[in-house]
Amino acid sequence: MIISAASDYRAAAQRILPPFLFHYIDGGAYAEHTLRRNVEDLSDVALRQRILRNMSDLSLETTLFNEKLAMPTALAPVGLCGMYARRGEVQAAGAADDKGIPFTLSTVSVCPIEEVAPTIKRPMWFQLYVLRDRGFMRNALERAKAAGCSTLVFTVDMPTPGARYRDAHSGMSGPNAALRRYWQAVTHPQWAWDVGLNGRPHDLGNISAYLGKPTGLEDYIGWLANNFDPSISWKDLEWIRDFWDGPMVIKGILDPEDARDAVRFGADGIVVSNHGGRQLDGVLSSARALPAIADAVKGDITILADSGIRNGLDVVRMIALGADSVLLGRAYLYALATHGKQGVANLLNLIEKEMKVAMTLTGAKSIREISRDSLVQNAEALQTFDALKQNNAA
């Protein structure tokens, strides 16, 4: 199969993965309107083409939380990453490390912190939820610090799990789920050999280390359902801010006032995100939410964005809308499921190439030069900055 874009990896991953795994990462909440709008709104952003600008010295390098990045991207935290390729977190982290960008390990990863951190040179980032079990949170933070993790990504848009209808149909949940998953596994031999047999253990590594016993998929579903805490507030984050002495990023911001609260709280960064459309259907896409948030806090806090990014052109669009950098989620997971570490490495190379083309043709020699001026702002560009801002205000 010819791979020339992230969409090719998605098609390949759908053939390789058991349906319960493919649809778990591919799907969203409820009727998936926000999931679709994430991609559509971003693709509708019109860039301003410029010519004869002497683009021979173009650079994608940037600095984020005092870390030098080869390009303004990081790999987002993705739960169960190790179920998509053999020891998937290790492979994805290696590809990011080789490229010179950060990898973010999820709380609910298959590979534990201690397995992933020693395999890379660059300090990885660690993602954590606010959970009822504060003992687990403290244990995870202590282990992340001991492993040299540099940045804490705190996910705050999951006080309760989202309603993901696809999961019941695919076998991730619903009647006879375990039997359905088993049948899917044995009928997808490439995955069964690579991950099912040779990717063991299939524990939730960070949780197993804390509980002192193996944890499987059923434990994952049950543990998360019982531990998300709908009572959380900014006050619950204060002890974490005191405990964690590195950069702290709040992930799951869609409203300018919440962004201002993050600044007042003392966070180092925010991620404009709707959890990839996996939590509440009907909320704004990240592309629509981003301009107003950038107006509110740009310069006061580092702004990252995710949800809907599928290529290097989308990265440039997000930066033009106000982000300093982006997180890649689904796009890299499709590549990981298809060709492991090499797939992720190839995807990152594709994104780099696509960014260079977009920057060359918009006249931006550096990441700093990508701005609102890179967008078409007239009546015909219905989904550019002004239109996005109006939609957000409405």
From Swiss-Prot:
GO terms for cellular component: plasma membrane. The active site is at 275 (proton acceptor). Its cofactor is FMN. PROSITE patterns: FMN_HYDROXY_ACID_DH_1, FMN_HYDROXY_ACID_DH_2. It is a peripheral membrane protein. Its EC number is 1.1.-.-. FMN binds at residues 106, 127, 155, 251, 306-330. The keyword Mitochondrion does not apply. CDD domains: alpha_hydroxyacid_oxid_FMN (cd02809). One of its GO terms (molecular function) is L-lactate dehydrogenase activity. Its main location: membrane. Keywords: Cell inner membrane, Cell membrane, Flavoprotein, FMN, Membrane, Oxidoreductase. Residues 1-380 form the FMN hydroxy acid dehydrogenase domain. It comes from the Bacteria. One of its GO terms (biological process) is lactate metabolic process. It catalyses: (S)-lactate + A = pyruvate + AH2. It is found in: Cell inner membrane. NCBIfam families: L_lactate_LldD, PRK11197.1. Catalyzes the conversion of L-lactate to pyruvate. Is coupled to the respiratory chain. Belongs to the FMN-dependent alpha-hydroxy acid dehydrogenase family. PANTHER family: L-LACTATE DEHYDROGENASE, S -2-HYDROXY-ACID OXIDASE-RELATED. This is L-lactate dehydrogenase. The gene is lldD.
